Swiss-Prot record:
GO terms for biological process: proteasome-mediated ubiquitin-dependent protein catabolic process. This is Kelch-like protein 35. Kelch repeats lie at residues 301-350, 352-394, 395-441, 443-489, 490-531, 533-579. Residues 41-119 form the BTB domain. CDD domains: BTB_POZ_KLHL35 (cd18265). Residues 146-248 form the BACK domain. SMART domains: BACK (SM00875), BTB (SM00225), Kelch (SM00612). One of its GO terms (cellular component) is Cul3-RING ubiquitin ligase complex. GO terms for molecular function: ubiquitin-like ligase-substrate adaptor activity.
Length: 583
């Protein structure tokens, strides 16, 4: 029995002339021709003083707004006039001509005539109208056009459009362009019209794509001078986010300190004094305004010097610089007399100092970051190892240690301008292998080994202004082979095979716990880089050197595992300096 074809199937070889996209396109073309000639139209849209005869059915098919409007209305004998007004008086394209032009583009799209956008202002006006009328496809077409036209010159204007219509991808792209081309963006008129909060947010961004901080300072001052009487009150607020210590010293003297607006602003004086102190005494490790922005030619790098191999038998000759952002290692000249061990290392005025050690215990070497070479400087009066160094008020302090017979009370201070060491007040209790850190203008010596080899929990505090020591609240541990760094007025202590990172607040004399480490180490390298505490290498609980690296972020309280060191090492030097990435 012969079976018939299903109703929806057509005979083989036959084409349905009333189906398919071509037919739909012909219908739309006919409707668009009727619209332009006013044929069979049943509604009039009015915008900017112009009338646009249209078909309700076509508008309802292409616009959620008109579909809802016409479905709720009652049939009328003649064509109704529907005013199409902007969303808000300040919306793009709100002039009469702009409103009419935007509606013409929307109607072309609804009737299938295509869309040809020529400028960002036009696209923004059409986007606003398409958003209001619920023409989804046209909205996406406008967004694609704006993304394709995004440049430094219009990034601020398009960011406002993105914010107005909640266009997250466009806003993100605008933000990228703003950061990458900030110096160019700041030269355009749109930048001068930003609100104070917007300027502050830009200046505070650590990812600004500027080669030098001078560009940030000049942008801030250009914005203020655009309307100085009204904006001079924002100077302090803006200058807080300019990293003045990163300016060239000559530029700072000629352009910043000599600026009339800044000279008249008493609120700005502490910031200028802070920058001047950094130029003279050296930067404070971890201070935000002394850290290069992420995409500068300059960057903070971690310098790792020498140390002992896995079994502690060999003294490593290497010195390397590590850039955490790119995870790139760069070899540096080896420290002369590398066979020394248990030396102390510290950074002062962006140079690296290494003092003492088990062999040549009086020697002090300086690695000049400018000359990229090691230079021998004045020797210690008292040879020592298992000591520590720290910087307070631009001077280097060598504290305690061991001379082969006894733990040392001795403290020496180094003046880099005269290249001389002088005795400072001795420690109340002699210690070696203690943690030493400077914070709030004072020196703190935490824990360590006393005479007889017994560990202590004492915290000894030195005030360089009075050349006097005092005792603070004892640490919640008694350990040696400790390390400490300070960051934002807090001291972080670790090492000593302790499983935790401890905190000490010199202002309140209170101890606390910050985080738990994945594995305990001692004699590790600890430094602050990019606002985080980096813990590199050290000896594990089996007495072997490790290549593990951890970072602790005080802002989140999280400890993260980082890529390993190039080799296992312990009892090494570890400091942070600023270096050109092109070197």
């Amino acid at each position: 029995m012969r079976q018939g074809h299903a109703p929806e199937e057509s005979e083989p070889g036959c084409e349905a002339p009333c189906a398919g996209p071509c037919h739909a396109q012909r219908v739309l073309q006919a409707l668009n021709a009727y619209r332009r000639s006013g044929t069979l139209t049943d509604v009039v849209l009015r915008a900017g003083g112009r009338d646009f005869p249209c078909h309700r059915a076509a508008l309802s098919a292409g616009s959620a707004y008109f579909r809802s409007l016409f479905a709720a209305g009652r049939p009328e004998r003649g064509p109704a006039v529907v005013p199409v007004v902007p969303v808000a008086p300040e919306a793009p394209g709100t002039s009469p001509a702009g409103a009419a032009a935007a509606l013409a583009v929307v109607l072309d799209y609804v009737y299938g005539a295509g869309v040809r956008l020529r400028a960002e202002d036009e696209a923004a006006a059409v986007l606003a109208l398409a958003e209001r009328l619920g023409v989804a496809g046209l909205r996406e077409a406008c967004v694609r056009f704006l993304e394709g036209r995004l440049r430094a010159a219009n990034s601020l204007a398009l960011r406002r459009v993105a914010a107005a219509f909640s266009l997250a991808p466009l806003a993100e792209r605008c933000g990228r362009v703003l950061r990458q081309a900030f110096a160019e963006v700041a030269r355009h008129a749109d930048f001068l019209e930003l609100a104070p909060d917007e300027v502050v947010a830009l200046l505070a961004d650590p990812a600004l794509g500027v080669a030098r901080e001078e560009a940030v300072f000049e942008a801030a001052m250009r914005w203020v001078r655009h309307d100085a009487p009204a904006r001079r009150g924002q100077l302090r607020r803006l200058l807080e986010h300019v990293r003045l210590p990163l300016l060239a010293p000559a530029y700072f003297l000629e352009k910043v300190e000599a600026d009339e607006l800044l000279q008249a602003c008493g609120e700005c004086r502490p910031l200028l004094l802070e920058a001047r102190a950094c130029f003279i005494l050296g930067r404070e490790a971890g201070a935000l305004r002394t850290r290069p922005r992420r995409f500068m030619d300059l960057a903070e790098v971690i310098v790792v010097i020498g140390g002992c191999d896995r079994k502690g038998l060999l003294k490593l000759p290497f010195a390397d610089a590590y850039h955490p952002e790119s995870q790139r290692w760069t070899p540096l000249p080896s420290l002369p007399g590398y066979t020394r061990s248990e030396f102390a290392a510290c950074a002062l005025r962006n140079d690296v100092y290494v003092s003492g050690g088990h062999i040549n215990s009086h020697d002090v070497w300086m690695f000049s970051s400018h000359l990229h070479t090691w230079i021998k400087v004045a020797s210690l009066h008292k040879g020592r190892w298992r000591h520590k160094m720290a910087v307070v008020q631009g001077q280097l302090f060598a504290v305690g240690g061991f001379d082969g017979l006894r733990r040392l009370h001795s403290v020496e201070r180094y003046d880099p301008f005269s290249n001389t060491w002088a005795a400072a007040a001795p420690l109340p209790e002699a210690v070696s292998s203690a943690a030493v850190a400077s914070c709030a203008g004072k020196l703190f010596v935490i824990g360590g080994a006393r005479q007889g080899g017994v560990n202590t929990d004492k915290v000894q505090c030195f005030d360089p202004k009075e050349d006097r020591w005092s005792l603070r609240s004892p640490a919640p541990f008694s350990q040696r082979c400790l390390e400490a760094v300070s960051l934002e007025d807090t001291i972080y202590v670790m090492g000593g095979l302790m499983s935790k990172i401890f905190t000490y607040d010199p202002g309140t004399d209170v101890w606390g716990e910050a985080a738990v480490l994945p594995s305990p180490v001692e004699s590790c390298g600890v430094t602050v880089c990019d606002g985080k505490v980096h813990i590199l290498g050290g000896r594990d609980d089996r007495g072997e050197s490790t290549d593990k690296v951890f970072t602790f972020d005080p802002s989140s309280g999280q400890v993260e595992v980082q890529p390993s060191l190039q080799r296992c090492t312990s009892s090494h030097g570890c400091v942070t300096i600023i270096q050109s990435l092109g070197r």
